[in-house]
């Protein structure tokens, strides 16, 4: 809550949050967590959906309750289940801007209703991915297919050592050392 309020004072356009990672268990816990953050500012709020950790049980009931929370204007959907993305889009319509959270599916997810993507590998390939997504949405499916197959090959190669790769890539590309991961 303090970080969300600080972000608002800094003039950001919106805030986001992962679900309660250490004390998960049910939809009520996730929705209470999101409500407290969303209600602490007037900023648009984009909760993360991380697989079954943040939408346990009935997805439609969860989305219905999520839409009742003030300032919720979208979601990041980190799932490989394209049917779930479509289902949420069909239920929420224009009430939620959906973002793909699975880098390896960002073109695929646009066909299911996402308006953009948020992910790890965009820190390195952001401009290329943005270009491909724009082209894909405008009908250049050949470019989308070719890029996605190559991008997925890279992701598959890097994934076992993703943090080491990302740390070195960020240092080489931006001269930013993002440091080692830390235990909670």
Q: Model segments located where?
A:
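Short glycine-/small-residue-rich flexible loop motifs, especially phosphate/cofactor-binding loops
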Residues: 4, 106, 167
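Helix-coil boundary/capping segments in enzymes
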Residues: 1-2, 14, 95-98, 178
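Glycine-rich tight-turn/loop motif centered on a GG-T
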Residues: 19-28, 137-140, 181-184
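Generic secondary-structure boundary/loop-capping signal
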Residues: 19, 47, 69, 79, ...
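Conserved short secondary-structure transition element at the edge of the structured enzyme core
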Residues: 110-113, 152-184
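Catalytic alpha/beta core domains of metabolic enzymes, predominantly
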Residues: 39-40, 51-159
């Amino acid at each position: 809550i303090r970080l969300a309020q600080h972000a608002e004072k800094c003039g950001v356009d919106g805030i986001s949050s992962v679900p309660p990672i250490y004390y998960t268990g049910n939809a009520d816990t996730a929705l209470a967590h999101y409500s407290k953050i969303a209600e602490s500012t007037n900023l648009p709020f984009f909760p993360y959906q991380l697989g079954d950790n943040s939408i346990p049980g009935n997805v439609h009931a969860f989305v219905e309750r999520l839409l009742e929370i003030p300032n919720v204007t979208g979601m990041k959907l980190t799932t490989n289940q394209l049917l779930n993305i479509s289902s949420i889009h069909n239920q929420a319509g224009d009430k939620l801007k959906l973002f793909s959270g699975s880098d390896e599916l960002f073109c695929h997810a646009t066909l299911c209703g996402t308006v953009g993507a948020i992910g790890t590998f965009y820190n390195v390939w952001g401009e290329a991915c943005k270009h491909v997504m724009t082209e894909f949405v405008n009908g250049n499916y050949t470019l989308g297919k070719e890029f996605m197959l190559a991008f997925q090959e890279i992701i598959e190669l890097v994934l076992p050592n993703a943090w080491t790769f990302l740390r070195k890539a960020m240092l080489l590309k931006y001269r930013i050392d993002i440091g080692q991961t830390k235990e909670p």
